[in-house]
Amino acid sequence: MNEMLTLVGQLRSDFGTSSARALRRQGKVPGVIYKKGITPIHVCTLEKEVAKLYRKPFFSSTVIQLQVDDQRFKVLPKAVQLHPVTEFINHIDFILVEQNGGIQKVKVPISFEGKDKSLGIKRGGYLNIVKRYVDLLCPVDKIPQCIKCDIANVPVGASIKVSRLELPEGCNLVKRTTDYVIASVIGKSSKQDKEEEGTAEDGADSK
């Protein structure tokens, strides 16, 4: 499991656009904690503190201990809204994580590795990333920071499907029945391959 991050917040009782704007003028971010079966918990936190966490690697898959007044919540980031110009964090939603070893749905980043060794990229292709995250069901104490995907042996024109990912023990895809594409190596079709095949054939004919 990732190292747990910490954040301090306050409960808020005023809602709506004007209230949210007032909080932002004070350097605070309105937020909501969600969990199926409970009433949403409205909170606010300091924008500068949220921004520090937001810039950390693997933010979306890291459990945060959120201290709200005299209560503590273990949460995962669900959605972050940024100002379109200033990139100030305007709003943040959290998911209250399952307790006592429960199974948690979480959005985990995909880390594409082996680009420097990729045969397809060396031959003029480039990596077209379709999905940067994968939705998993994980034990709360085994949420991975990221899921690695080795593309070293992926040729030009090949697609990489979600079934290629090696998931940690106990973690499963939310959509098990759909083997969707997460990336592909695209570029000029293998002119170089044809030239190499021609060279090989010439060599064979000369023997």
Curated annotation (Swiss-Prot):
Gene Ontology cellular component annotations, sorted alphabetically: cytosolic large ribosomal subunit
Gene Ontology BP annotations: translation
InterPro entries xrefs: Rbsml_bL25/Gln-tRNA_synth_N, Ribosomal_bL25/Gln-tRNA_synth, Ribosomal_bL25_b-dom, Ribosomal_bL25_C, Ribosomal_bL25_long, Ribosomal_L25_dom, Ribosomal_uL5_bac-type
This protein's UniProt keywords: Ribonucleoprotein, Ribosomal protein, RNA-binding, rRNA-binding
GO molecular function, one term: structural constituent of ribosome
Family assignment from sequence similarity: Belongs to the bacterial ribosomal protein bL25 family. CTC subfamily.
Task of the protein: This is one of the proteins that binds to the 5S RNA in the ribosome where it forms part of the central protuberance.
Subunit structure: Part of the 50S ribosomal subunit; part of the 5S rRNA/L5/L18/L25 subcomplex. Contacts the 5S rRNA. Binds to the 5S rRNA independently of L5 and L18.
HAMAP family named in the record: Ribosomal_bL25_CTC
Protein name: Large ribosomal subunit protein bL25
